[in-house]
Amino acid sequence: MVPALRYLVGACGRARGLFAGGSPGACGFASGRPRPLCGGSRSASTSSFDIVIVGGGIVGLASARALILRHPSLSIGVLEKEKDLAVHQTGHNSGVIHSGIYYKPESLKAKLCVQGAALLYEYCQQKGISYKQCGKLIVAVEQEEIPRLQALYEKGLQNGVPGLRLIQQEDIKKKEPYCRGLMAIDCPHTGIVDYRQVALSFAQDFQEAGGSVLTNFEVKGIEMAKESPSRSIDGMQYPIVIKNTKGEEIRCQYVVTCAGLYSDRISELSGCTPDPRIVPFRGDYLLLKPEKCYLVKGNIYPVPDSRFPFLGVHFTPRMDGSIWLGPNAVLAFKREGYRPFDFSATDVMDIIINSGLIKLASQNFSYGVTEMYKACFLGATVKYLQKFIPEITISDILRGPAGVRAQALDRDGNLVEDFVFDAGVGDIGNRILHVRNAPSPAATSSIAISGMIADEVQQRFEL
């Protein structure tokens, strides 16, 4: 007999569904700041869904919301391995609403970021979620950076980023009085928000529409059912079995995985390809002391170096008024390793046997050494920051939080730059859709991504 599962869902009613017993309803929260999800439970005999989303981060929750709003007659559930939602990449990022300037023209990142930023601002206004459209300067501090800055500006225009302009020293000072620079791109549509608050609002919308959220459900297997469950009246209507580490299982017709740092492993569990592999990069942030936060008004970014895969250390205001400096980018020895000495033997073994990572490390050895040096010595990071704001000293800096970025890597050692969506082959492959690579700007793009996923699900699964 399948053990009963605990759901973080409303117990106020029943939603429509395509299986016996329906789905727990929502508690009718008013719009505005997301409230805690209300508790409820369901018996094992009704642990079946038409669609299951694996992963309770911002992309998974946005996708669940989009699907249930488009298909209100379907029963849809979200599985999350933690006791709370949106606690990893969604809850450990800089909170920047990106404009879409950095990405290759015509790529999914470029299209979905520009579209997603506009949708996100609109959503926050509708829901009363606080945000600040504080803008961003991408600043050239050396003469040799100016051609790269101008090329980036042209890329932004190709991507349709609104409001971009090139500005000179005097205009840089008007926007950021303490920032030095020769030339900058002014990105007025860049902003900041608390993405966990946005994700919890998505979850609230999902539940109000009749969706169900299961926490503490760590998936360890996804397979096709071999027979009907004991005492089931559904027979083989729900042919996919999803099992967790506690021996519990649910059944469903279709699966969408949005597993972030574990997207490759979840794909492999379902019998699909593990490639591209996920490599975890930890990013450490520093904090400006409160009495020095006046030095920064909006986002200040360096000109990215196309030889290296990350954007570089930058200045980021937060919704609480603090200023974050960073992040760096160093290889993490645990997929959820937020501290320098966090270690997982399984994750390290993945790193050792990953031929693509060995190639990446050899191609970017000097960059990696520099990032490790900055992570260990505050003075090195401060020296870099002083290129932009000379007034900053090491006594103005505190160590801050960290995040871990899930970055897909191919077998040739190339970082997969665009969003990747994949499916498998055979019976289960026809019933599953994997979100395989969704690093930054996935949070900014989450509403746009969810619309694309809903389109793909509708077409692929013939809903």
Curated annotation (Swiss-Prot):
Its cofactor is FAD. One of its GO terms (cellular component) is mitochondrion. InterPro entries: FAD-dep_OxRdtase (IPR006076), FAD/NAD-bd_sf (IPR036188). It comes from the Eukaryota. GO terms for biological process: 2-oxoglutarate metabolic process; small molecule metabolic process. One of its GO terms (molecular function) is 2-hydroxyglutarate dehydrogenase activity. It is found in: Mitochondrion. The keyword Transcription does not apply. The modification N6-acetyllysine is found at residues 104, 155, 173. NCBIfam families: PRK11728.1. Was named 'duranin' in honor of Marinus Duran, who first described L-2-hydroxyglutaric aciduria. Belongs to the L2HGDH family. This is L-2-hydroxyglutarate dehydrogenase, mitochondrial. It comes from Homo sapiens.
